[in-house]
Amino acid sequence: MALFGKKDKKPAANLSGKSRLDIKVKKDGAEYTFLLEGRLDTITSPDLEAKINEIVGDAKKLTLDLAKLEYISSAGLRVLLGALQAMEGKGDMVVRNLTQSVSEVFDLTGFSNLFNIE
């Protein structure tokens, strides 16, 4: 199931050489934890969206660990919002370990009120 109805969307290529996002996925039954490291921006957000699309049908809990996320853009926020909407009625979604800069973006955009933050 695609988050936004786009089943064939391919991850964007890293053209800038500056944007990088490492995504590690840990699975425990139907609970998934995504550990994000780097930048979640226009270049890298399709990669996260694709990985979330792979698991959202089976997931009962989705945790995004942002302890090593340096930056998040509006494109990254869109992917997080899509994940939240996809998990609605299926299970829980938790965002944890926000860095100061990411926490400030969440506060400014109102995302702090939308997500279960640990």
Feature-to-residue mapping (PLM):
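N-terminal leader/presequence segments that are low-structure
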Residues: 1-14
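Conserved catalytic-core motifs of GNAT/GCN5-like acyltransferases
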Residues: 118
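Amphipathic alpha-helical interaction surfaces in cytosolic regulatory modules
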Residues: 42-115
